[in-house]
């Protein structure tokens, strides 16, 4: 038997646990103050309108709903992006962010059969799985500094500088998973310059746009690469979190070409790759996202709802740090400096095991916790348990 997915396996154990007051800090889902997955008002308005219209659900084109692809381009690259004006971006709706990664990986494997893929150490577990399954050799570049609970930026630059030209570099645009440690704009500028100098191929994964500072600020890495003069790069993005549409599997793959003609050729290759995989994406989730982003009024409402989610996560980080400090554990202050849904808590596997066994609190063995799963009702429970295993 193949080894099970650690996150899915942990979720199964959590569901089977009958203890009251259990808390799941392992799975990557945003929950509201009631511990529920929210249904956003902007999404609900589009869904209700769709239900009233009663449109049939035919197959979408291979690259998805045109309105969805166009709205994605504006959100990811910026509405005034020169790349969009020049027609240099080929975008396809995909089955979630994972689907975007796999379609992109399959396409690049055919185009660059001798290239390697470099991912951050650590990275989201599925990054290595996806690119390995596509046939790539995957290598690591330095990223997280366990001693400072921050970014090992000198190590990152050193490792990127050693990569062979043509290497595909997987970069997290914002809200790094699993660490929550991000680059500053100034650091991104240095990375962009180095990637360009070394002739590396950037593959940017943006699954959490809007969960740190806002939709535009969180796309800074994409915008910097777009302005850099680099001929080609790849972006995979997901709406699972930002639209709270986890089960709808709404993602997109965008590939920048050197010219309009190259982008058109790339789009043809992407469609061929999709056709041999799942033929076309699902209708419902894409229509919801396109409906929200295509309405000025609903776009404003969605941005405000996204801001509420973002601010609640910030508040949970601050509350956790404050309550731990009150128990003499000021060393956890770094949690407040991290961004997005996740935190590399610094807890050891032994401490994580104790949280599960003694307190019915579930987390990943690496110490990653989902801050978005905290709320006012369970925060004290979690803090007291973390304090107990930390002393």
Tell where the protein language model's regions lie, with residue ranges.
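N-terminal "arm"/small-domain region of PLP-dependent enzymes with the aminotransferase-like
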Residues: 1-67, 71-74, 78, 276, ...
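Hydrophobic beta-strand scaffold residues
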Residues: 25, 138, 202, 362-363
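Conserved core of the PLP fold type I
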Residues: 44, 49, 54-197, 210-211, ...
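Hydrophobic "anchor" residues on beta-strands that sit immediately upstream
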Residues: 168, 201, 233-234
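Active-site PLP attachment segment
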Residues: 220-265, 269
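Structural signature of PLP-dependent enzymes
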Residues: 267-286, 292-321
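Conserved PLP-binding catalytic core of the aspartate aminotransferase-like
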Residues: 302-358
